[in-house]
């Protein structure tokens, strides 16, 4: 009797037979070795992992969701890691406080011993401590054991739902609000004394504003001098760069500076103040060193220009003009040119003009000759100082180069017509300005006739005339070197070498004739004052009155100085010249358009020596004694020329200070020399 065995259909092979064992995976008939798992049979080749396909017949496996999976794939998909060693747990597992451990990993964090069965476990954060170790722990605060939490806002227990951890407290999400406006804080917040605030309410009550942008500061703040700035708003007012952390900064009012920028600004301010003080009494448009600038002086707290200052008596202008070596200048070319030309018409040479006035004169003379003479050619043959070509036919002007000044000074004299070579060139008559009623000095110059032999011999000796006729019409003497015919040597007193230049014999006659031509009583009075001042002897303000008979050296101006390169100088014996008795008491014709102070103009006569008319020996001093301090020049030696401090340096020290020789220095323009002297603190 056959009994039927109940058959369960294979899901892989629904067709089945009760007499044949079929594979659970592929459904084919199983022959030979088979694997039986839970009453299911498999071919050995068919019993593989459902994920990676590896064979499971010789290794362990897991069955989950009707799938056979190897150990590695099961751990990656469904495995549990140990909370201590972070490895997958297979076999026994210990769960405590929602965490799982290997039995060997569940030990005390302090003594590293396994927990006894049934013992209490103290959990503090990430550490599990046994009861023995928890009692021996020294702590000022009791260890919080995880348990029921209370909201810091409503003080109720947080039983379920999401909690918020802020300010080291737990809150209900709906309880974490701004203390002022009660807005739920879901984003950024600012706390003060453990109380949360929204950003706007915190700034309104406790906020700090930036001094630059006037906005509230959130985050990093830069504090300096009790003021607060955003790090990006605190910038140097000079270089506009931000300050790095810990960098030093200067605070001036509402401005911040880098230390280097502050020092540079102070230096620029001093330089600007210095330039402003020099041009404080000059009108707009004038510039320092310009050839069109005229000396202005301060007398009795009043600013006087050249025109007004020239009308003062010389004694008043000498002793009451304040600091003539530092007074400013202003352009007044119209009056300057007229008065200077009139002074030349009265017989004075440009050696009497100041360095600034001579520059104006030379530029004016150059423009007049260009405009009046169509045959004038501006070529390198002619000197840059405005010296016209020397022709023997020109009886009105010829130029005598200064000893060392680097520029040519016109010397007015009358030449003998018969000693000149005939030529077609006729020099134009210069310096003729029509007279005006407003200025008593505007009188036309007195020109002598060409054929007047007597007047020609008065103004120039025959040797001088013969020497000047040696120059060819296309060659002019070098303005930087003096010709040998202009000086006569002598053996004078052994004390101090003295020298003088011959003056034109007709100058005093011209002055007398101009005196008679003046119809105005004021003009005659002013000219008498000048004649009286010229005929009087001035006292040296730097020498005591009792030493008036001692030998004194006259202070020197820009035109004539002692040679340093050995060029010949004129020496004349006082006892052998009858003209000295007549003119020794008069001040020399020096280069001074204004009546400057005695520091630059007074010349003295000593009966034991010859008269010094524009030449002197400079006493050598160290460079440190000649430096000009900020509080004035009261510390300088008394016998120095304050307008030419560089002349008191030795040749070696002069080269060290200026980087050039004295002759090279004299060839520079006046403004350039003054700038170099300012840089060397000798001005």
Curated annotation (Swiss-Prot):
InterPro entries: AbLIM_anchor (IPR032402), Actin-binding_LIM (IPR051618), Villin_headpiece (IPR003128), Villin_headpiece_dom_sf (IPR036886), Znf_LIM (IPR001781)
Statement: the UniProt record of this protein carries the keyword Zinc: yes
Superkingdom of origin: Eukaryota
Tissue and organ distribution: Expressed predominantly in heart and brain.
Region named Disordered: 372-472
Modification N-acetylmethionine, positions: 1
Domain HP, first and last residues per copy: 615-683
One biological process term in Gene Ontology: cilium assembly
Gene3D superfamilies: Cysteine Rich Protein (2.10.110.10), Villin headpiece domain (1.10.950.10)
LIM zinc-binding domain location: 21-80, 80-140, 149-208, 208-268
Compositionally biased tracts (Polar residues): 380-393, 406-426, 454-471
Residue numbers bearing the Omega-N-methylarginine modification: 631
One term of GO molecular function: actin filament binding
Keyword terms: Acetylation, Cytoplasm, LIM domain, Metal-binding, Methylation, Phosphoprotein, Repeat, Zinc
Phosphothreonine modification, residue list: 543
Predominant localisation class: cytoplasm
Residues with the Phosphoserine modification: 277, 280, 282, 286, 290, 337, 372-373, 379, 388, 493, 503-504, 567, 576, 607
Cell compartment(s), UniProt: Cytoplasm
Keyword Metal-binding: yes
Stored CDD domains: LIM1_abLIM, LIM2_abLIM, LIM3_abLIM, LIM4_abLIM
GO cellular component terms, semicolon-separated: actin cytoskeleton; cytoplasm; glutamatergic synapse; lamellipodium; stress fiber
Phosphotyrosine modification, residue list: 376
Subunit architecture: Directly interacts with F-actin and ABRA.
Cited function: May act as scaffold protein. May stimulate ABRA activity and ABRA-dependent SRF transcriptional activity.
Classification via PANTHER family: ACTIN-BINDING LIM PROTEIN (PTHR24213), ACTIN-BINDING LIM PROTEIN 3 (PTHR24213:SF0)
Protein's name according to its UniProt entry: Actin-binding LIM protein 3
Organism: Homo sapiens
Encoding gene (name): ABLIM3
């Amino acid at each position: 009797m056959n009994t039927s065995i109940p058959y369960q259909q294979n899901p892989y092979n629904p067709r089945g037979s009760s007499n044949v064992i079929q594979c659970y995976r592929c459904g084919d008939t199983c022959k030979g070795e088979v694997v039986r798992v839970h009453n299911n049979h498999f071919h050995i080749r068919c019993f593989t992992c459902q994920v990676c396909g590896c064979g499971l017949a010789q290794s362990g496996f897991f069955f989950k969701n009707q799938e056979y999976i190897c150990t590695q794939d099961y751990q990656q998909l469904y495995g549990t890691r140990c909370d201590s060693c972070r490895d997958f747990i297979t076999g026994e597992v210990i769960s405590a406080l929602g965490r799982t451990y290997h039995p060997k990993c569940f030990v005390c964090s302090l003594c590293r011993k396994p927990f006894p069965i049934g013992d209490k476990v103290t959990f503090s954060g990430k550490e599990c401590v046994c009861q023995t170790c928890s009692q021996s722990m020294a702590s000022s605060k009791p260890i919080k054991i995880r348990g029921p939490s209370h909201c810091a806002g409503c003080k109720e227990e947080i039983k379920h739902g999401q909690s918020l951890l802020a300010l080291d407290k737990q809150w209900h999400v709906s309880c974490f609000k701004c203390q002022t406006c009660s807005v739920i804080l879901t984003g950024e917040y600012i706390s003060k004394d453990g109380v949360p605030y929204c950003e706007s309410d915190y700034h309104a009550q406790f906020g700090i504003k930036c001094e630059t942008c006037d906005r509230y500061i959130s985050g990093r703040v830069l504090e300096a001098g009790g003021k607060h700035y955003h790090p990006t708003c605190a910038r140097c007012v000079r270089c506009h760069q931000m300050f790095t952390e810990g960098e030093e900064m200067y605070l001036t009012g509402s401005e911040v500076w880098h230390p280097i920028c502050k020092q540079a600004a102070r230096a620029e301010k001093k330089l600007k103040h210095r330039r402003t003080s020099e041009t404080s009494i000059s009108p707009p448009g004038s510039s320092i060193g310009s050839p069109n600038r005229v000396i202005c002086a301060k007398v009795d707290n009043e600013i006087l220009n050249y025109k007004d200052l020239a009308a003062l008596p010389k004694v008043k202008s000498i002793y009451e003009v304040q600091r003539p070596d530092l007074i400013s200048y202003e352009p007044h070319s119209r009056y300057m040119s007229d008065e200077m030309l009139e002074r030349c018409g009265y017989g004075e040479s440009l050696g009497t003009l100041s360095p600034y006035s001579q520059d104006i004169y030379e530029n004016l003379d150059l423009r007049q000759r260009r405009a009046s003479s169509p045959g004038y050619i501006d070529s390198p043959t002619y000197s840059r100082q405005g010296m016209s070509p020397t022709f023997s036919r020109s009886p009105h002007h010829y130029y005598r180069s200064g000893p060392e000044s680097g520029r040519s000074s016109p010397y007015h004299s009358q030449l003998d017509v018969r000693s000149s070579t005939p030529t077609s060139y006729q020099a134009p008559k210069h310096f003729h300005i029509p007279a005006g009623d407003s200025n008593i000095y505007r009188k036309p110059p007195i020109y002598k006739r060409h054929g007047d032999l007597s007047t020609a011999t008065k103004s120039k000796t025959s040797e001088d005339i013969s020497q000047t006729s040696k120059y060819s019409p296309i060659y002019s003497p070098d303005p930087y070197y003096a010709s040998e015919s202009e000086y006569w040597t002598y053996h004078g007193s052994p004390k101090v070498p003295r020298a003088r230049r011959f003056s034109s014999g007709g100058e005093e006659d011209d002055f007398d004739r101009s005196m008679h031509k003046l119809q105005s009583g004021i003009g005659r009075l002013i000219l008498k004052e000048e004649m009286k001042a010229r005929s009087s002897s001035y006292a040296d303000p730097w020498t005591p009155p009792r030493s008036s008979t001692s030998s004194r050296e006259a202070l020197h101006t820009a035109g004539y100085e002692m040679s340093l390169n050995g060029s010949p100088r004129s020496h004349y014996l006082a006892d052998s010249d009858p003209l000295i008795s007549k003119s020794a008491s008069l001040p020399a014709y020096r280069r001074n358009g204004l009546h400057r102070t005695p520091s630059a103009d007074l010349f003295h006569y000593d009966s034991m020596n010859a008269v010094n008319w524009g030449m002197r020996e400079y006493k050598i001093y160290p460079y440190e004694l000649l430096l000009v301090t900020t509080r004035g020049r009261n510390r300088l030696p008394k016998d120095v020329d304050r307008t030419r401090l560089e002349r008191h340096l030795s040749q070696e020290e002069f080269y060290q200070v200026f980087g050039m020789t004295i002759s090279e220095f004299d060839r520079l323009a006046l403004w350039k020399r003054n700038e170099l002297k300012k840089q060397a603190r000798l001005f």
